[in-house]
Amino acid sequence: MAPGEIIGPNVTRLRVDRELSQAVLAERAGISRISLGKIERGETIPRAKTLFALARALRASAADLVTPVEPLSRVRFRAARRVNSREQILAETSAWLSAYSWLEKELGQERHFKLQDLVGSSAAPAELAARAREGLGVGPREPVRDICGLLEDNGLKMLLLEKASDLFFGLSVGPADGGPALVVNTWERISVERWIFTAVHELGHILMHLDAFDRRQTDENVDEERQADRFASHFLMPEGVFEDEWRESGGLSFVERVFKVKRIFRVSYKTVLYRLRESGRMGSDVFAIFQAQYKRLAGRTLKKVDEPQALAEGEFRFNWSSAAELGDSLSKYDFVEDRLSRLVREALEKEVISLGRAAEILALPMTEMRELAGTWVQ
């Protein structure tokens, strides 16, 4: 591949991701818009000075501009609306997956996907969720405490990306491209409960819809999304246990009851409401009823990104006087992938990779990589 065919698409992809027009990027890099256009089309190869200027303007490294991106083909990345950073997310996923797979092979730590026998199953989402829990060693009444650790220990690779977008929650990659792998958007404005749900939702796609993984497909398939939602809901809240908890909390107000059950299963309040509607316990107006009762108690309605704090364990009353200070009921430490970091540490200690390569794989500046390595203990 000619240099221009690598640099041009990389510059364009990063520019779109940074939401910069050609005119703005050209001005920041000190070149004309016409020159930038030629670079992006691959008609001109920028000189070193221009290359570094473009990298600075794009908040990237020169290596980011000259390194070819291995395209993913068997990937599911769909959204109801266009995600401008789509190509950059796919590029970052490709680079991460390539490094991850290489490390596993070099260290002899490749893992078999424990749920491979369930891929392509025709079972209903709820039944498949029960079988998946069993296959991962999760008891029928056991809550899922560490979803990242559970999935990574059983052969799934996980990448946590922080993208300032409420249009992108996650994607999944098939085995043909180095997967199965999941990518979850851990932007701070998305609740931890949503991160957890997204991970299991994408697992559902891998088990049920792998034959539909196609990079070229960008529009959501409503039926497949609903199936993945049902799978995630029943994986995190098995119906039998949910029924018991819902019945036992029957003396609480509707809102308090939802919050208590939400806290037990570590899911969003919306997941509980969907289950109530799906199971026929309540009708299609369940969300309107919840919002109306919440407003009477808290003095405000919940916005799209709000995830109110649930009742503390063993608590039967909610402190409505502090409702304005509600935050996520789970912290970011409830959703941490750490297998790649462990592989990087082992590779460093065995001198398989350099500190610079370790920083590159973990997407850390060298100073932060040195600090991290300095904190490692036995």
Feature-to-residue mapping (PLM):
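Active-site hotspot residues in diverse enzymes, especially metal/ion-binding acidic/histidine motifs
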Residues: 1-378
